[in-house]
Amino acid sequence: LPRIPLVASRADFVAVATAGRGLADLHQDYETVEPWELILTVDGKEVPWAQRDTIDPALLHVTKLRYAKTRVDGKQADDRSSIVYNEHVTLSGIPETAQDYLLGSRSGLDWLIDRYQVKPDKASGIVNDPNEWMAEGAGQGNMAAPQPRYLLDLIARVTTVSVRTQQIVHSLPPLDVRD
């Protein structure tokens, strides 16, 4: 069973409890947090984040997300501050701290890159296509309008959640735990 340590002071308890509430709210409401203002490049032209609704939905079809590439010591390496959405759209300006919050062994953005791709299920042969899901309203119900920008916003929101999580965790005082 998990053991909840007894902290040495009330101030430590209040700090941990407040951080815990903040983290719970942040993670439970991840789809409603303010999206991180990423830099959008569409067909080589920068589009301000606030104008992402002007992007033609036909340019938002995703097949497989990936990190952009950069050269480090003469070798190709992932540029984890930039995600190639498709051949038309790139998102950049992802803070390094967004990659520091890990869910298991990967960041939240790593999980998105892995999961939001067109991919057939090996056992059933059913194709998992996030484009169809977004066209059907992204889980908002039978009468929902298509949400072609859902994944753009989700990437930005996961970035916000990851950065804020790191801020909350790093704001905690060192704990004096009683045995």
Please identify what each model-predicted range represents.
Residues 1-179:
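Sequence-level detector for compositionally biased, low-complexity segments
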